[in-house]
């Protein structure tokens, strides 16, 4: 295969979810294992999430971001101890970037009644919109992609020869975060400005829905030293591994840099669900790992300068 022919594999998960032969599940496990080893990314069809729900989610996303700016700012994630809510354009910038991201975003997670463990658990912030226009479809979608993220973790464990029994403790009370994103039209983006600058995801499994026909995601190919454009296909998800998976798998699964550039005229919408595991869970990708570092400890190191993490919260996750 020439460099020009390189593309992310498209894997059909239906062979794992509803196998028709004794080999179907193992074939999917091996395909996902190989994709995560070679690319750290793959595309996924046959995932079981209705396309009607995907479209409802994207419609709800559009409704949210079309609200007046002053109404959106009332939902600011900076006012929330769990960092749930709205992020305005220009508020994210990574070290080395010339300009901040052009995207707008809205964050939500598990719906817990009180703030616990450094803000990783707690209540969401919901806009004042009719239930059927936002909260209903968004929450249903969150639950569906949460289940899909868990399934991918199960496959990753089996790809390294471990039993899915390890998921019982790992998924006891999982940290699952979701991010709704709107990228502005290229016509209103500054020259050289990215929708999202180059970065690695920091945690576990990412489940990404792209608005069909609105390309923008690019993945870095280290061997070829080039960016690979990932097409935005209808009813096809993009799955990738974060830094936690790469570390815990001993590098057998990759975490790879990626970025977003809106390449088509008009807005571009997407939604990413991040499945990390229980805050007190340790490494299921290597049960014999002597480090015994927990999900919470890893995420605190990543977030301690972004979230309102106080001494009590650090002690709760064993990081004090």
UniProtKB/Swiss-Prot annotation:
Function as written in the Swiss-Prot or TrEMBL entry: 2-oxoglutarate-dependent dioxygenase; part of the gene cluster that produces the tetronate natural products trihazones. ThnC catalyzes the oxidative decarboxylation of trihazone A to trihazone D. The C4 hydrogen is first abstracted by the iron-oxo species generated in ThnC to give a tertiary radical at C4. This is followed by decarboxylation and removal of the second electron by the FeIII-OH center to give trihazone D. The pathway begins with the formation of trihazone A by the hybrid PKS-NRPS synthetase thnA and the trans-enoyl reductase thnE.
Annotated positions binding 2-oxoglutarate: 268
UniProt keyword Iron, yes or no: yes
Annotated catalysed reactions: trihazone A + 2-oxoglutarate + O2 + H(+) = trihazone D + succinate + 2 CO2 + H2O
Similarity comment text for this entry: Belongs to the iron/ascorbate-dependent oxidoreductase family.
Pathway annotation from the record: Secondary metabolite biosynthesis
PANTHER family: FI07970P-RELATED (PTHR10209:SF881), OXIDOREDUCTASE, 2OG-FE II OXYGENASE FAMILY PROTEIN (PTHR10209)
GO BP field: small molecule biosynthetic process
UniProt-listed Enzyme Commission number(s): 1.14.11.-
Domain of life: Eukaryota
Gene: thnC
Cofactors, names only: Fe(2+)
Fe2OG dioxygenase domain location: 174-278
Binding site for Fe cation: 199, 201, 258
Gene3D superfamilies according to UniProt: B-lactam Antibiotic, Isopenicillin N Synthase, Chain
Keywords associated with the record: Dioxygenase, Iron, Metal-binding, Oxidoreductase
Key word Transcription present: no
Binding note for cofactor: Binds 1 Fe(2+) ion per subunit.
Source organism of the structure: Trichoderma harzianum (Hypocrea lixii)
Top enzyme class: oxidoreductase
GO MF annotations in UniProt: dioxygenase activity; metal ion binding
Protein name: 2-oxoglutarate-dependent dioxygenase thnC
